Amino acid sequence: AIFTIRNNXQQTVXAGAVPVGGGQXLDXGQTXTLD
């Protein structure tokens, strides 16, 4: 499965809700893809 996380908010968010993501931070508009 492929999971795409996008931060649509104005602030930086941590993608810590996804264990595989390792809690990386996403700036506004950034995406992270996990497979």
Swiss-Prot record:
It comes from the Eukaryota. InterPro entries: Osmotin/thaumatin-like_sf. Induction: By phytoplasma infection. Belongs to the thaumatin family. This is Thaumatin-like protein 6. The lineage of its organism: Eukaryota, Viridiplantae, Streptophyta, Embryophyta, Tracheophyta.
